[in-house]
């Protein structure tokens, strides 16, 4: 799940996330999102994102093109996610490291990752996520930009699950 970010950043996230092996991207509209996707332009935006997904899948020699879903409000995205392991990168998390969390759940067949917008995940969004079994994880001591956090977390997940360099 990726919060709405600036146009070029979202396109870059889609491209790089697919190169790293994700199976789908669910854009999410969150309280602190700076950019709001105009509903009238959603179909055109999805078409563009899917073309980027197709090109990235081809470049990385993937047989299956990941799906870019239509943006959802955060509450619906958090409550409808059915992944075995639901992770939320939270900038003030001090206890749960991404690595330790992944090592505690080696049997997870599917992993969802929520990355917040530039303004971070709101308290209400955090509480709702926690109530629906999303685990808060730290990506380290620094505050990362949305696109950096997404790719750092994806690379770490791929590495820990044996899908990158191992």
Label each residue range with its predicted role.
Residues 1-87:
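RNA substrate-binding interface of SAM-dependent RNA methyltransferases
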Residues 3, 118, 142, 146:
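Glycine- and other small-residue-rich loops at beta-strand/loop junctions that grip anionic moieties
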Residues 9, 73, 120, 148-149:
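Residue-level recognition of oxygen-bearing side chains
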Residues 42-46, 104, 155-156:
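Short, hinge-like loop/turn segments at secondary-structure boundaries
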Residues 72-78, 94-96, 144:
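A short acidic, often aromatic-flanked loop/helix-cap motif at beta-alpha or helix-coil junctions
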